[in-house]
C-alpha cells in the first residue's frame, strides 16, 4: 500500500508540480488522499498524450472508468493492479469513512473526470467552443477539487462555489498552456 502512495506522490510531483506543491500545504492527514486523487487526474489526463491512436486512448480511459467503479465501490472490493487504483481505493475508503463511506457524489465526481476525457478523446476536431472548454474544465478540475474538499471534511456551499470557479480557471489555464502556437 505504501508503495502505491509513493508512486502517486512521484507521479504528481513529476507531471503536475504546481498541484504537488499545493497538496503539500494541506494538513498532513489529508495529503495522501489528495495525492491519490491528483495522481488519478494525471493518469486520466495523460491517456490522450500517451498514444497517437484515439482508440487506444479510449481503451485506457474506459479502463480507468472500470477502476473508478472498483475504487469507489465496496470497501472489500479488489481494485485493479495499478498503484494509482490501489491508492485511490484505499484513500477513498479511509478518508470518506467519517461521512458514511464513498457515496454517489464521489462516484459522480470521479466519473465526471473520466467521462469528460472520453468525450475529448472522441472529438475528431478541435473543441467546438468556449462552452465546451468551460464544461470540460468544470468536469475535470472542479470535480477534482470537490473530491479533495470532501476528503478534507469541507462540505460548504461557498467552498464548492469557489472550487467551481477555481476549477474552471485551472482547467482553462492548463488547456491554454498545452495549446500549440
For the regions a protein language model found, what residue spans apply to each?
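Acidic catalytic motifs of isoprenoid enzymes
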Residues: 1-168, 172-181
